[in-house]
Curated annotation (Swiss-Prot):
The lineage of its organism: Bacteria, Pseudomonadati, Myxococcota, Myxococcia, Myxococcales. GO terms for biological process: division septum assembly; sporulation resulting in formation of a cellular spore. It holds the Pfam family SpoVG. It comes from Myxococcus xanthus (strain DK1622). This is Putative septation protein SpoVG. Belongs to the SpoVG family. Keywords: Cell cycle, Cell division, Septation. Could be involved in septation. It comes from the Bacteria.
Length: 99
């Protein structure tokens, strides 16, 4: 599995830093991943749905630690690149997420 596209949509909230959409192997899109600033730094939260009992259940998630680590590394690298471009004034408006 290769992450072939990462789109970062920054938000200005306390802990939530961005929503992210990824494309796998040019053929499968996962939306609404979140970049969150936790007590130990940035991490990725998988898209989830709130259940009737108030708990959240992942809609999609990696099945092993290696895949999760690869996803987190690629997404956070792209998030950091996006931040640096925005600070340097080089950021072009993100394309609409119409996939």
């Amino acid at each position: 599995m290769n992450i072939t596209d990462v789109r970062v949509f920054p938000v200005e909230e306390d802990k939530l830093k961005a929503y992210v959409t990824i494309t796998l192997d040019h053929c499968f899109v996962i939306r609404d991943l979140k970049v969150i600033h936790g007590s130990t730094g940035l991490f990725i939260a998988m898209p989830a749905k709130k259940r009737k009992d108030g708990t959240y259940k992942d809609i999609a998630h990696p099945l092993n630690a290696d895949t999760r680590s690869q996803m987190e590394r690629v997404i956070l690298m792209e998030y950091e690149r996006h931040l640096h471009q925005a600070q340097a004034g080089m950021l072009v408006a993100a394309p609409a997420d119409l996939d």
